[in-house]
């Protein structure tokens, strides 16, 4: 699309006409789209004018720094993915993953108060929201994949150090820390933290998912921990409501210790910002004694 046509379309949007913008733009995602997902919503918006044009009854607003859309599906569906494409295209950077978030609702629910932190040059955006039937609202298959032993829920292979044979931190995804002992990852709205380390000889045991109907500000799950199901490593993923660009990370920890003397272990989720979906990948090793920590990580997990 040439610049004249692009400016003409943006002009129509700014005067309240709903026109799909089709040219190169910067893409932002929450969640992961699959071909069988249903389109719940699609619209184009101008990002410079307030009040913005209401589409299908969903309220929206613009200020100097943010665009906000209040979406709630009238179908019996839960949100599986959200895509925002902004125009014109600007060089992307690693910080983009934090510029789109749901203040309330989100993946796994039927609503999202969608907040987009704009840049000055961005003047229009397409928004696409997808969903799946609410009766089950399971995303396990799309985040486990075909090879959960070797590939994480971001689609990245687990990599190991030579000294211990334990997995190493990711360096090609946004990373944050708390108290220098807890590491959090974040991409496309999907958060992650890991409890202890994955060893090359571990086995993938199961994936436990917790959907929105079972999630509170504080909740827990019970995991088996005996014989061949002795827990060696947990890879924990979730979506959460985020009030600001800087999220408040949850506290995820065992209730007490998870030692080889425990037949079960309780994993506790203690949150300030409500989760909307969680997935725990459980890895096991009958030889694990629960001491898989490095000196610099004391206090982690």
From Swiss-Prot:
Q: Which domain of life is it from?
A: Eukaryota
Q: Where is the signal peptide?
A: 1-23
Entry keyword annotation includes Disulfide bond: yes
Q: Name its species.
A: Lutzomyia longipalpis (Sand fly)
Residues the record marks as carrying a glycan: 262
Disulfide topology? 52-60, 78-137, 102-112, 258-265
**What does the tissue specificity note say?**
Expressed in salivary glands.
Q: Describe the function of this protein.
A: Sand fly salivary protein with antithrombotic, and anti-complement (alternative pathway) activities. Is a slow, tight, non-competitive, and reversible inhibitor of factor Xa (FXa, F10). Is specific for FXa (Kd=3.86 nM) and does not interact with non-activated FX, or all other enzymes tested. In addition, it blocks prothrombinase and increases both prothrombin time and activated partial thromboplastin time. It also prevents protease-activated receptor 2 (F2RL1, PAR2) activation by FXa. In vivo, it abrogates edema formation triggered by injection of FXa in the paw of mice.
Its quaternary structure?
Answer: Interacts with factor Xa. Associates with complement proconvertase C3b-B complex.
In its UniProt entry, what is this protein called? Answer: Lufaxin
Q: Name one GO molecular function term.
A: toxin activity
The UniProt keyword set, sorted, is: Blood coagulation cascade inhibiting toxin, Complement system impairing toxin, Disulfide bond, Glycoprotein, Hemostasis impairing toxin, Secreted, Signal, Toxin
Chloroplast listed as a keyword: no
Name one cellular component (GO) term.
Answer: extracellular region
Localization recorded for this chain is:
Secreted
């Amino acid at each position: 699309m040439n610049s004249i046509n692009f400016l003409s379309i943006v002009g129509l949007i700014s005067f309240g006409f709903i026109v799909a913008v089709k040219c190169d733009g910067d893409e932002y995602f929450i969640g992961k789209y699959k071909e069988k997902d249903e389109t719940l919503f699609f619209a184009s918006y101008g990002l410079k004018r307030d009040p913005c044009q209401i589409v299908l009854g969903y309220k929206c607003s613009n200020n100097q720094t943010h665009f906000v859309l209040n979406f709630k599906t009238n179908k019996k569906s839960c949100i599986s993915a959200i895509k925002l494409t902004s125009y014109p295209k600007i060089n992307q950077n690693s910080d983009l993953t934090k510029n789109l978030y749901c203040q309330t609702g989100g993946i796994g629910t039927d609503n999202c108060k969608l907040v987009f932190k704009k840049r000055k040059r961005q003047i229009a955006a397409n928004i696409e929201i997808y969903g799946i039937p609410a009766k089950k609202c399971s995303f396990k298959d799309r985040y486990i994949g075909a090879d959960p032993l070797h590939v994480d829920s971001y689609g990245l292979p687990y990599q190991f150090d030579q000294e211990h044979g334990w997995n190493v931190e990711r360096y090609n995804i946004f990373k944050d820390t708390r108290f220098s002992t807890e590491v959090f990852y974040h991409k496309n709205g999907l958060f992650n933290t890991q409890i202890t380390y994955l060893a090359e000889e571990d086995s993938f045991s199961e994936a436990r998912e917790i959907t929105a109907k079972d999630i509170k500000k504080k909740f827990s799950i019970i995991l088996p921990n005996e014989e061949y199901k002795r827990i060696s490593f947990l890879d924990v993923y979730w979506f959460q409501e985020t009030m600001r660009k800087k999220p408040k990370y949850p506290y995820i920890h065992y209730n007490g210790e998870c030692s080889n003397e425990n037949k079960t272990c309780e994993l506790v989720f203690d949150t300030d910002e409500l989760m909307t979906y969680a997935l725990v990948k459980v890895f096991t090793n009958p030889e694990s004694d629960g001491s898989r920590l490095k000196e610099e990580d004391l206090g982690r997990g």
